[in-house]
């Protein structure tokens, strides 16, 4: 990739930013970085500048960035627990700031957004006594447990079953059916986290909605703070389970892109197959 090509692409990205098309500009930056990575090229200071402009701070290359971009990379670095530190992107940082301020947040963002980083950072910084995390499946509960246990088992009792004895500080990671076992066992919960909260609506998941809605209402009564997550919700109508919560929507904040490709049969060209190829530059979530 010639320097002149990089310059032309960066010029177009700058035009998009000037015309308030930030989401499109971010997509073009990701495409540029993917191409540079595949060709084994370094990020120039100009490329690092536009990484910063679109808020993808974790992608900044400290080896080639100017001191301004290096400062941003360090400024957004956050403790995620267990000695792990990560640089958050701009949208993650906005959500974490609101949570640390005590706000109740309903967040809609794509899977690649890195919502789990925000949870870990909140626990590491705020150090709440009791956290309840409701997840859609037992498999996801186990996956979340492994992550949380690795970082916080020295400070908290990590609970995934219905018959555990509570300690002074607890993190419960449960499907909604199991969460009922702890209704009435807490005087208060410092943080209630619900993944895929939109499934409390019967229009999305009739089989899960009743038990999830009941769990959200009962545990929500004693929760000092709530953080609800969903992948692609564009708005929230007035309802009982998100009453009083602030809706933050980042459905267009992409940290990866999906490129459609076409695969033709060599013989006869009889079929056309559409494939989806996610392009991921570095691990965000």
Enumerate the predicted regions with their spans:
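N-terminal helicase ATP-binding lobe
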Residues: 1-276, 280-285
